[in-house]
Amino acid sequence: MAASTSHLRSLCSSTRSLSRSGVIVTPIACRGYATTDPSPSATTPTPVRRRTTFKDKLNAGPSFSDFVSNGNDNAPLDPSEAYALKTALVGPAGRKKEMTRLPSWLKTPIPDSKNYQRLKKDLRGLNLHTVCEEARCPNISDCWGGSDKSSATATIMLMGDTCTRGCRFCSVKTSRAPPPLDPHEPENTAEAISRWGLGYVVLTSVDRDDLVDGGARHFAETVIKIKQKAPSILVECLTGDYAGDLDMVKLVARSGLDVYAHNVETVEALTPQVRDRRANFQQSLRVLDAAKKAQPTLITKTSLMLGLGETDEQLWDALRQLRAVNVDVVTFGQYMRPTKRHMAVHEYVTPDRFELWRQRALEMGFLYCASGPLVRSSYKAGEAFIENVLKKRRAASGGAETIGERPVAVDEASR
């Protein structure tokens, strides 16, 4: 420390002696960077890397798609190979479990189209819900992603997004005390549908056992509002069972809708394991029967899931009972487990078997049957056929409404 101090003093004394001798000492005021850009003349060209034998082999070798297809892109598959289910080990090391992969015929694209974004924006803006989103429907990219307004379809879910029942196959939220009904929902729903310019719309709802009428009047009011804004639109209503209150079923059936749908979901023997304890197969049959008797011109419709462990004889029995109450349309679709909390899939039914049951249903006298792994009760493939049938019926009757077809007010329909 003493040495550095003496050195500093000697520097200062030398500076003072220079100033006394007439020499002006100017401090250096320039700065420079640690590194500077080299001049163009100093820039050396980057040497070109020599092509290697390894790189040549890669360029001449198989592409990524060849690896994915395993080299069998054009090789025909027999049914046993095409429908073979693959497995994979899933989980942390030491605790891996063998899981069955989703079959290729059940895979769908991720929704991302202009129509999809438009429908979603309209629904959120009007505070409306859809069963497409709540039930995690695999067809949402297809139904919402049409190339124009007329081909896009959304199934609007009325009375909120919370159900009072807890079926073991359904992913809709449940609660014993869901939020109260939105009094503006009928008007908002009619506004959304008129904005989309659709020719066919599907309405459904959660079960509301907390309400005296199960929400039937709210449902009927929505149909009436839609018909007031767009008289030519065809309306399908997928309703609950209203706890077996057939007067409420008749109220909705007489509200002016065109298709009355109520799903039995599965065969009678499996109903206690699949559906909520407050629902049963015979009660669902009575709902469909009451709707047809209240409005004979209605098309009645129901849906069953396959892959829950049902037998052929149980399916035959279910179809016979449905035809006995004059159900017009039936659909078959693959049950797909929404979460680990729900029922496990017993079987992935092949497309060939779905086609077999479609033919059997038509032979039994059903007006129409949509059957396939991805078919759902409100899938748009069925709507196109039903729309044509309804238009032909209207044309045959001269387009005039009969007294039985006239939509009535909610209070009048409940009498």
UniProtKB/Swiss-Prot annotation:
<comment type="similarity">
    <text>Belongs to the radical SAM superfamily. Lipoyl synthase family.</text>
</comment>
<keyword id="KW-0809">Transit peptide</keyword>
<dbReference type="InterPro" id="IPR031691">
    <property type="entry name" value="LIAS_N"/>
</dbReference>
<feature type="binding site">
    <location>
        <position position="163"/>
    </location>
    <ligand>
        <name>[4Fe-4S] cluster 2</name>
    </ligand>
</feature>
<dbReference type="GO" id="GO:0016992">
    <property type="term" value="F:lipoate synthase activity"/>
</dbReference>
<feature type="binding site">
    <location>
        <position position="143"/>
    </location>
    <ligand>
        <name>[4Fe-4S] cluster 1</name>
    </ligand>
</feature>
<feature type="binding site">
    <location>
        <position position="132"/>
    </location>
    <ligand>
        <name>[4Fe-4S] cluster 1</name>
    </ligand>
</feature>
<dbReference type="InterPro" id="IPR013785">
    <property type="entry name" value="Aldolase_TIM"/>
</dbReference>
<keyword id="KW-0496">Mitochondrion</keyword>
<keyword id="KW-0411">Iron-sulfur</keyword>
<keyword id="KW-0808">Transferase</keyword>
<keyword id="KW-0408">Iron</keyword>
<dbReference type="InterPro" id="IPR007197">
    <property type="entry name" value="rSAM"/>
</dbReference>
<keyword id="KW-0479">Metal-binding</keyword>
<feature type="binding site">
    <location>
        <position position="167"/>
    </location>
    <ligand>
        <name>[4Fe-4S] cluster 2</name>
    </ligand>
</feature>
<dbReference type="Pfam" id="PF04055">
    <property type="entry name" value="Radical_SAM"/>
</dbReference>
<feature type="domain" description="Radical SAM core">
    <location>
        <begin position="148"/>
        <end position="367"/>
    </location>
</feature>
<dbReference type="InterPro" id="IPR006638">
    <property type="entry name" value="Elp3/MiaA/NifB-like_rSAM"/>
</dbReference>
<dbReference type="GO" id="GO:0005739">
    <property type="term" value="C:mitochondrion"/>
</dbReference>
<feature type="binding site">
    <location>
        <position position="378"/>
    </location>
    <ligand>
        <name>[4Fe-4S] cluster 1</name>
    </ligand>
</feature>
<keyword id="KW-0949">S-adenosyl-L-methionine</keyword>
<feature type="binding site">
    <location>
        <position position="170"/>
    </location>
    <ligand>
        <name>[4Fe-4S] cluster 2</name>
    </ligand>
</feature>
<feature type="binding site">
    <location>
        <position position="137"/>
    </location>
    <ligand>
        <name>[4Fe-4S] cluster 1</name>
    </ligand>
</feature>
<dbReference type="Pfam" id="PF16881">
    <property type="entry name" value="LIAS_N"/>
</dbReference>
<dbReference type="InterPro" id="IPR003698">
    <property type="entry name" value="Lipoyl_synth"/>
</dbReference>
<feature type="transit peptide" description="Mitochondrion">
    <location>
        <begin position="1"/>
        <end position="33"/>
    </location>
</feature>
<dbReference type="GO" id="GO:0051539">
    <property type="term" value="F:4 iron, 4 sulfur cluster binding"/>
</dbReference>
<dbReference type="GO" id="GO:0046872">
    <property type="term" value="F:metal ion binding"/>
</dbReference>
<comment type="pathway">
    <text>Protein modification; protein lipoylation via endogenous pathway; protein N(6)-(lipoyl)lysine from octanoyl-[acyl-carrier-protein]: step 2/2.</text>
</comment>
<keyword id="KW-0004">4Fe-4S</keyword>
<protein>
    <recommendedName>
        <fullName>Lipoyl synthase, mitochondrial</fullName>
        <ecNumber>2.8.1.8</ecNumber>
    </recommendedName>
</protein>
